[in-house]
Amino acid sequence: MATKNLHFETLQVHVGQEQADPATDARAVPIYQTTSYVFHNSAHAAARFGLQDPGNIYGRLTNSTQGVFEQRVAALEGGVAGLAVASGAAAITYAFENITRAGDHIVAAKTIYGGSYNLLAHTLPSYGITTTFVDPSDLSNFEKAIQENTKAIFIETLGNPNSNIIDIEAVSEIAHRHKIPLIIDNTFGTPYLIRPIEHGADIVVHSATKFIGGHGSSLGGVIVDSGKFDWVASGKFPQLTEPDPCYHGVRFVDAAGPAAYATRIRAILLRDTGATISPFNAFILLQGLETLSLRVERHVENALKVVNFLNNHPKVKKVNHPSLSSHPDHALYQRYFPNGASSIFTFEVKGGQEEAHRFIDSLEIFSLLANVADVKSLVIHPASTTHSQLNAQELVEQEIYPGTVRLSIGTEHIDDLIADLEQALAKI
C-alpha cells in the first residue's frame, strides 16, 4: 500500500501494518510480548549490535508492536522516525538530554506544562543544564535569551493549562538563525489539528497518554524526528556528528542519516536509562490512534460550545480560550488551527480558591483527576495540584490564580456537560 498521498484518517489506521501480520495473518497488530529476539547467526548478531543492520536486538530498545506505533505517529506528524517511550515525561527528558551536556543551556516558553517546567527549572540544572524561561507573547524574548551554549528552544503548540499559542514559524526562524533546533510539544495540538514540522519544528514530542491514547488507560510518550535539521552544518552537536566511543567510533549522522537524532536516543539513552514502553501499552495506544481524528473533532466541537456557555455566565470572571476574539492569541488561533482546537483550557470563577473548590466538588459528570484529553470530561484546580510546586510568582507568571479551573472537555453529549457545569456554578 502506497501511503504517500493518503489522507490522515487512512494513515492513522494503516501505517506500519499495511498488510496482515506476516507470521500469523492477523489483521490487528499483534502484541509481541517478548524480551529478546533470535539472531540468524553470530555475524547477524554482531551487525545488529554494531548498528550496521537495523532490527530488533532486545526489548529495552525495540519491539515489533512498538515499531508499528512509532511508524504511524511519525507518518502522521510528517517525520522520518519516531521513538516511543514509557511516558510523555520520558519523551521530553530524552528530547533535551540527547543534545545537551553539562554546561549547556535551553530557552523555553514560561507557559509550558508544570511538569516540563519543573524538569527544566529544577531537575536538569542538577546535571549542569540550565534554562531561561521567557514570556512568549514577545518573540524578541526568545532571541534575547539565546546564549553561546544554547542548544534548543522549547515551546508547546497549545500551552498547558491556558491554551496560549505561539507563532511557531517565527520562533523556528529565530532558532534556525542561531543554528539550534526547535523542539515542540504537540500533545494538546495533536497531528490531526496541526503538524508542527510543516511550520518549522525540528523535533516533536507527545504525551501519548493524552489524545493519542484517548481513554485514560495507558501511559506512553513519543518523539518524532523531522529529519530536517542539519546537525553537521550547525556545528553545535558533537553527540551526533563526532565518533561515539560506545559504538567503536560510529557517527550517528553517518549511520542513521536524517534519523540521527532519534537513532541516538534509542541507541544511547534508552539503552542506558531504559524508559521503555511496554508492548501492551503500545498496542493500547495504537487502538486509540485509529480513532484520533473522530475523537478530536468531537472534543473540539464540544469545547467551543462550553467556552461560549462559560463566557456568558455571570459567575465566571474570565475564560482563557484562543477561539474568543478577545483572546490575545486569537489571530494565531485562526492561522494555525483553521479546524479549531483546544478542548483543554482554563477559566476563572469569581471569588477565589474556595469558590473554585466548591464548583469542582459539585460537578457530577466531570471527573476530578490529573489526566487530560480523555473521552471523559475532566476537571482540576491547577494551583493546588498540577502546578502546586510552583511558587506564588511563578503561578502568576503562568496566569494561574486561586480561582483558576482547568477543564478537559470529553465526547459526552454537550447538553449533559453544560447542565453539569450550570448546576455546579449555581452552588458558588
Regions found by a protein language model. Name each.
Residues 2-63, 71-72:
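N-terminal "arm"/small-domain region of PLP-dependent enzymes with the aminotransferase-like
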Residues 41-93, 115-123:
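Conserved N-terminal alpha-helix of the aminotransferase class I/II PLP-enzyme fold
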Residues 9, 80, 121, 130, ...:
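PLP-dependent enzyme catalytic core of the Aspartate aminotransferase-like
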Residues 224, 346-348, 408-410:
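Short hydrophobic/aromatic beta-strand micro-patches
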Residues 158, 187-189, 324, 350, ...:
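Active-site beta-loop-alpha junctions enriched in small/polar residues
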Residues 273-276, 280-282, 287, 291, ...:
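Conserved small-domain helix->loop->beta segment predominantly found in fold-type I
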Residues 2-3, 16-20, 83-312:
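Conserved PLP-enzyme active-site core in the AAT-like
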